[in-house]
UniProtKB/Swiss-Prot annotation:
GO molecular function terms listed in the Swiss-Prot or TrEMBL record: 3-isopropylmalate dehydratase activity
The reaction(s) this protein catalyses: (2R,3S)-3-isopropylmalate = (2S)-2-isopropylmalate
Name listed for the protein in its UniProt record: 3-isopropylmalate dehydratase small subunit
HAMAP family, A to Z: LeuD_type1
GO cellular component, one term: 3-isopropylmalate dehydratase complex
Family: Belongs to the LeuD family. LeuD type 1 subfamily.
Domain of life: Bacteria
Record flagged with keyword Metal-binding: no
Oligomer and partners: Heterodimer of LeuC and LeuD.
Organism annotation: Delftia acidovorans (strain DSM 14801 / SPH-1)
EC number(s) from the headed UniProt entry: 4.2.1.33
Listed GO biological process terms: L-leucine biosynthetic process
Pathway(s) where this gene product acts: Amino-acid biosynthesis; L-leucine biosynthesis; L-leucine from 3-methyl-2-oxobutanoate: step 2/4
Function: Catalyzes the isomerization between 2-isopropylmalate and 3-isopropylmalate, via the formation of 2-isopropylmaleate.
Amino acid sequence: MQQFTVHKGLVAPMDRENVDTDAIIPKQFLKSIKKTGFGVNLFDEWRYLDHGEPGQDPASRKPNPDFVLNQPRYAGASILVARKNFGCGSSREHAPWALDQYGFRAILAPSFADIFFNNCFKNGLLPIVLPEATIDMLFNEIAAFPGYELTIDLDRQVIVRPQGEEIPFDVIAFRKFCLLNGFDDIGLTLRHADKIRAYEAERLATKPWLAHTLVQR
């Protein structure tokens, strides 16, 4: 998993409440057995005027010129500012995969759906909860200043606005540790690889019949 330490990026606004996971990545794209390739279908039903199916060439489709991420001023955005209850709906982990693979590193909103919130951390995305008044201020500044960028310093737990003012935010210490070090669940487990190997060796030496039973099954 990619580390998150300090990130500076262009900000895009998603001015809708209750954006659910089916809007983030529609159900027809969940058929893939791979974990990659979802970025091109992020917000598919809003992003394109035609219906999308897995395997379609995005270049052959009709983009919706009114959708925010299709507007030239937000091309290459890596920070998304959203409204309350972002990521509600089903618990599909494909939603943070799609956001990450599109290029987003952080999402700022007044609130998130719980499962989506946790899935973001597990996939290298930083979801930040901010007061609604702060989110309103950011929406206003994004609209007023083309090319609006923010700097997010996870170690210091601050968001730095273009003028230099800092917005503090909270993050659970364990989640912060994982993002700073790039640890997903597998990475956390592999930190103890030596102990796991030692345990398996001891078990094989003291209870060899268990290994034999497993092989027979």
